[in-house]
């Protein structure tokens, strides 16, 4: 764990000490995953990992619970497995995906899973809302978006 400045810590949760090989998506599964904590507000930045690494993180002793989850792999079908989502237990999720992207991210199954867990009003998607800005003073969290979405 790295103390960035007083009251702000950053923990690298992935890649593992021994890189994953043979996962079917090694490049994604060895992506950097960070947990940033400022006061009582925490962010889990899940990068491009997929179910393989999410499962690994669930089975480790890392603290995953975070107020904000930046959903893994643009909300692809191979990410945000139920066990991982349950362990993170976010209040807010951000899905970063380009509008009309060729991969169809986020996958409807993942978007629905997040909606069921958090409610639509707590999910922010760059494909629909443009830039998503999260601001915290270490106690409260404010979210603003470039565009409104019904």
Where are these regions (language model features)?
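Non-globular, low-confidence helical/coil segments that flank catalytic cores
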Residues: 1-150
